[in-house]
Amino acid sequence: MRLLHTMLRVGNLEKSLDFYQNVLGMKLLRRKDYPEGRFTLAFVGYGDETDSTVLELTHNWDTERYDLGNAYGHIAVEVDDAYEACERVKRQGGNVVREAGPMKHGTTVIAFVEDPDGYKIEFIQKKSGDDSVAYQTA
C-alpha cells in the first residue's frame, strides 16, 4: 500500500492552480472536466503520480467557498530555506500566517502559509547536511 493523494475542495480552481504551481512550484499533472457532474479535478505535485503523493484539487462548479471546519490541520512541504520560501509567498501576494523560525520546544525551522482557500501549508526546512527533514512539527 501507499498514499496516493490528498483531496482539497477549492472555490476558484484557476487561483488555486496559480498558487500551487507558481508559488509552491508544483506541476499540473492532469486535469479533467466532468460536465455531467459539474466538477473539475486537477492533480498537482512535485513528482509523477506513479511514485509520489500528490494533491487532488476538486472544483465543484456551483460552489464558491467551503467551510474548512476545525478538523483539518495542514499539509507539510519540505523546503531548502523556510525564510526564503516565505518571502517568495509574500512576493506572489500569498498569506504567511507564521513566519519562519524554530518550532516551539525544538530547533526545526518551520513556517505556515495559507492557500487561496485558507488551507494551511507548513514549510519544514531541510536540516543542514541531512537528506531528510526532521519530522517534528508543532
UniProtKB/Swiss-Prot annotation:
Lineage top rank: taxon: Bacteria
Enzyme Commission code? 4.4.1.5
Q: Which GO BP terms apply?
A: methylglyoxal catabolic process to D-lactate via S-lactoyl-glutathione
Which keywords has UniProt assigned to this entry?
Lyase, Metal-binding, Nickel
Q: What class of enzyme is it?
A: lyase
Record Gene3D superfamilies: 2,3-Dihydroxybiphenyl 1,2-Dioxygenase, domain 1
Indicate the family of this protein: Belongs to the glyoxalase I family.
Protein name, per record: Lactoylglutathione lyase
